[in-house]
Swiss-Prot record:
Main location (coarse class): secreted
Record's subcellular location: Secreted; Secreted, Cell wall
Keywords for the protein's UniProt record, in alphabetical order: Cell wall, Disulfide bond, Secreted, Signal
Disulfide linkage: 35-86, 42-83, 43-49
Keyword hit for Secreted: yes
Its job: Aerial growth, conidiation, and dispersal of filamentous fungi in the environment rely upon a capability of their secreting small amphipathic proteins called hydrophobins (HPBs) with low sequence identity. Class I can self-assemble into an outermost layer of rodlet bundles on aerial cell surfaces, conferring cellular hydrophobicity that supports fungal growth, development and dispersal; whereas Class II form highly ordered films at water-air interfaces through intermolecular interactions but contribute nothing to the rodlet structure.
Observed effect of gene inactivation: Affects hydrophobicity only when HfbC, HfbE and HfbF are also deleted. Disruption of all 7 hydrophobins leads to altered germination kinetics, decreased survival under exposure to extreme cold stress and increased mycotoxins patulin and citrinin production.
Protein name: Unclassified hydrophobin D
Keyword hit for Secreted: yes
Signal peptide: 1-18
Amino acid sequence: MKFYIVLLALAAFAMAEADPNLEARAGCSQKGKYCNGGTFLCCPGQGSCKGNQIAKKKYSASEAPSTEGVQRLLLVTGYALECLGCLFSQTPGYSGSVLPLLNSH
């Protein structure tokens, strides 16, 4: 059930982040591609131009995370939980539950 709630929240976030003015973004370049000095333009929300390429965008604490940022956070969280499970499984006397570990002291 939690999985479906997270999936629904991510879908809603991705839909909210989509720019409704796609025509204005048609000539925009992707990160690392040419921008103002080249054939493409830097676009709002993508970062700034540094030299002839789009630089990485700096985020502020008041700004909502991007879909890419949320995906990275979920990936790191998944790895952390997987690692935590590995740590418990290596504990002598571990039976698959944390309760015996808590009651042993």
